[in-house]
Amino acid sequence: MGSPPGRGPLVDGERVLLIDAKERRYLLTLVAGAAFHTHAGILAHDDLIGREEGSTVSGSTGRSFLVLRPTLADVVLKMPRGAQVIYPKDLGAILMAADIGPGQRVLEAGVGSGALSMAVLRAGASVVGYEVREDFANRARSNVAGLLGPDVDYRVERRDVTEGIDEVGLDRVLLDLPEPWRVLGPAAGALRPGGILLAYLPTINQTAELRGALAEGPWGLADSVEILRRTWHVEARSVRPDHRMVGHTGFLTTARRLSAAPASGTGPEAPVSPAR
């Protein structure tokens, strides 16, 4: 009986991450008989195939590389891309904010290079993507298949989500679009009551526009956040924040789809009568 995927010795055809002495990272797919060419020399793929991950290997010049299987964050940062990707610090927050889990049906509009699709699929959901650009759609399909294989429950259609959503009874709708407020009508019709809408936007002006539109429709519990990531230098007695940090990348806005006919005065956004 073989090892589960992602365990055991490295095999022909899987992705690996090489890290050199300066912690530069290289993502490659192992191919028997091939070689990896770098400033540090040539490293034969055959010298990696069959090794345990966590091993140290040397190239033709004697310089060493640590070899590991890549994490999802490694793949997102190193994979081929056309559109700007959603960064790992935001991907984790999106999975929590949208409460993504196994068995859910998710619509993603604006798939870009497929980073968010990968994260949602890995969490066990199925994904239908709407993408207006064929080159982005093809890149997303390729990147997802490269990480998760061809059998994941993933379909990308070339279409404009503002023209309508065919799916109904969706659990989640994820939007990476410049004008997500134009999709609120179709999204409300596609989401089940209690479902979650999440939009990723680069500017606060766009976020404010979206929040205003949400306040006028069947949405409740709207919330907007920004995720900042700061690493620390920790070495012996030298402990301080790193000089550089991953600051603003985008704003995450979530809202719950309310029932079409909520009881008067019982919803979370229900107006409060002034005291007399």
Where are these regions (language model features)?
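Conserved SAM-binding loop of SAM-dependent methyltransferases across substrates and taxa
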Residues: 113-124
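Conserved SAM/SAH-binding loop
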Residues: 87, 112-113
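C-terminal substrate-binding/active-site "lid" region of AdoMet-derived donor-dependent transferases
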Residues: 2-3, 181-251
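Conserved S-adenosyl-L-methionine
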Residues: 122-128, 193
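Conserved SAM-binding loop and adjacent beta-strand
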Residues: 7-8, 77-92
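Conserved class I S-adenosyl-L-methionine
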Residues: 101-112
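N-terminal auxiliary segments of SAM/dcSAM-dependent transferases
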Residues: 1-69
